Amino acid sequence: MEFPKALIKRPNYHFEYPHKRKDKRIGRGFSIGELEKAGLNINNARKLGIIVDIRRKSVHEENVEVLKKFLEQLSNQKS
C-alpha cells in the first residue's frame, strides 16, 4: 500500500511565467488540522507511517479526503 502525499499551494514568484507555474506541489507532510479533521492525532498518524508537518497551519480539504480514503483502505485490509 502506498502512503498518501500532502498537496500544498506553491508560492508565487514574480520571475515565473504563469503558464509554467503549477498550482500545487507535494508538501513535506500533513498539517495537524488536516489530521484532526480526518479523525487522527499526531501519534497515531506517525504509527501508521503518515508524515506530519507540525510547522504548517493550513488545512486543505483535498488532503483531508486523501487521509479519510487511506484510513478506509486500512480498515478494509484489517477485515
From Swiss-Prot:
GO terms for cellular component: ribonucleoprotein complex; ribosome. InterPro entries: Ribosomal_eL13 (IPR001380). The keyword Ribonucleoprotein applies. GO terms for biological process: translation. Coiled coil: none annotated. It holds the Pfam family Ribosomal_L13e. GO terms for molecular function: structural constituent of ribosome. Keywords: Ribonucleoprotein, Ribosomal protein. Belongs to the eukaryotic ribosomal protein eL13 family. This is Large ribosomal subunit protein eL13. The gene is rpl13e.
